[in-house]
């Protein structure tokens, strides 16, 4: 691998801009800054060779530099062909950290980028930090000889976690993994509050559409769907939910949303957002019944929720309006506006989640990497969670920035509740 490129980004000349953006983001990411303060001297990740496959954004750049500060060697690729922020990638490359990512990769380039992160100067990767499971799957299928040397996987997102559990059930998973997604300070913050802000940002930047007065259809009412529905309602849209789960459907109904099927909702909606992580949510028969210039987008991890293939094969005309905005004319004369080719709209058409909420998620990632690297005996092959105490520590690290003052339990109160004054304050099954 001696002839490997030290990095490949769109434009290394963007590094100075990227560095300015990182400086601002650091001030909004108190959890990661706390990790640096606490562990920069002890370097708990010394010896770790972390291959990361996660959206190469400004926030991710702060995560990468935190991992390096804690002693790790790091090589990086993005987990989505459109999600890289080129100035952030340039800043990381300029800092001497191998990164292989640019906005607008082809599928072939995407795979090439991931493969560049597998071998370091001192040997192959020994840790995985993944978002969506593409790196994990690639190692298990194409590079199984590397598996014995890998100490652990930390997985960022719902789709990747589903993949891990599926692999475990089928006896395919060969490496211990920590499910970062289902840490409370990830799923109840990044998935909900992050999407609540970044969805609208993506739709607005792509289309400049007025949301007030429109009918918005949100497929799925998990944490991501909840955040999207709140945002659209907040901007004045009438929101319709589609759901498979009776509990989530009841939650949506109790919040005042109409809940129906996509076969019915497709005739009413002006804006469609898929959030499910499942295949075949919006199909050809739905497109054919949509209103003229219906806006269709996805905020789930992969591009499988919207049948983009059907659009490309059946539309009479496809006009590219601007990057990641395409207008299809159907045989019935009506048009469909598709954002980000059915991939993540908030990263394809905007800048993704704000730095503060990503600090929650990425502090969990750092803790997961430290746990797996320093305590391998605690984590046999399987899918694990971070301890509740660490989840609470992530939240606590972010309170000062918001000027939050916690009430402290007295010894008498703690004894009455049967817990320590310092937590954990909830049982593992508590849902928040």
From Swiss-Prot:
Family classification: Belongs to the adenosylhomocysteinase family.
Chain sites annotated for binding substrate: 57, 131, 156, 186, 190
SMART domains, per the entry: AdoHcyase (SM00996), AdoHcyase_NAD (SM00997)
GO cellular component: cytosol; endoplasmic reticulum; extracellular exosome; melanosome; nucleus
Molecular function GO terms recorded: adenosylhomocysteinase activity
Note on cofactor: Binds 1 NAD(+) per subunit.
Transmembrane annotation, as ranges: none
General function of this protein: Catalyzes the hydrolysis of S-adenosyl-L-homocysteine to form adenosine and homocysteine. Binds copper ions.
CDD domains: SAHH
EC number: 3.13.2.1
N6-(2-hydroxyisobutyryl)lysine modifications at: 186
NCBIfam families listed in its UniProt record: ahcY (TIGR00936), PRK05476.2-3 (NF004005)
Species, as recorded: Homo sapiens
Cited InterPro entries: Adenosylhomocyst_ase-like_sf, Adenosylhomocysteinase-like, Ado_hCys_hydrolase_NAD-bd, NAD(P)-bd_dom_sf, S-Ado-L-homoCys_hydrolase_CS
GO biological processes: one-carbon metabolic process; S-adenosylmethionine cycle
Protein name in the entry: Adenosylhomocysteinase
Outcome following mutation: residue 71 to S: In HMAHCHD; affects nuclear-cytoplasmic protein distribution resulting in increased protein amount in the nucleus; results in protein aggregation and formation of inclusion bodies
